[in-house]
């Protein structure tokens, strides 16, 4: 059995990372505290933590075949995924699969900030791309 600890972050696909970063930092007042390129996922991300430790994650593709680049081409900018922080990602994946949830990732992989991540297929989540994640330091 696993436990959901919090909404970890909301991932927003953007065409211009600097514009997005400036909006969330200067207009909304949630400063960017980290920027990272995750080569394996062909994405650059920025993180804007809120006082309750949930974050806004901005994502931009770094290649034409990046899932984020393809997402923006198909659907435009906007919310791309919601991530839930879990206490044990391996248990979460096993429990979800046992309940018939279709997983994009049947094993955790490493995402931004070194988090262990896995995605649930939108066909199992009523159309929402849902990420589960586990952080060593949270």
Label the predicted regions:
Residues 18-31, 97-99:
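Amphipathic alpha-helical segments
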Residues 19, 37-41:
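Short glycine/proline-centered loop/turn elements that form peptide/ligand docking sites
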Residues 71-99:
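Mid-chain, well-packed structural core segment of small domains
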Residues 7-14, 24, 48, 53-59, ...:
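Short, structured motif recognition centered on aromatic/hydrophobic residues
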Residues 29-37, 101-107:
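Short secondary-structure junctions
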Residues 43, 65-70:
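A short, acidic/glycine-rich surface segment
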Residues 2-3, 46-49, 56, 84, ...:
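Vicinal oxygen chelate
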Residues 1-19, 77-86, 134-138:
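N-terminal beta-strand motif that seeds the catalytic metal site of vicinal oxygen chelate
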């Amino acid at each position: 059995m696993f436990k959901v600890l919090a909404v970890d972050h909301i991932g927003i696909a953007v065409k211009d990372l600097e514009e997005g970063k400036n909006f969330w930092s200067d207009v909304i007042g949630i400063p960017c505290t980290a920027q990272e390129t995750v080569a394996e996922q062909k994405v650059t991300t920025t993180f804007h933590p809120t006082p309750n430790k949930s974050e806004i994650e901005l994502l931009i593709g770094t290649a034409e075949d990046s899932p984020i680049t393809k997402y923006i081409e198909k659907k435009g900018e906007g919310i791309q995924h919601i991530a839930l922080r879990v206490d044990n990602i391996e248990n979460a994946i096993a429990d979800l699969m046992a309940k018939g949830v279709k997983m994009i990732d049947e094993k955790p992989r490493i995402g931004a900030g070194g988090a262990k991540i896995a995605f649930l297929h939108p066909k199992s989540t009523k159309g929402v791309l849902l990420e589960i994640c586990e952080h060593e330091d949270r």
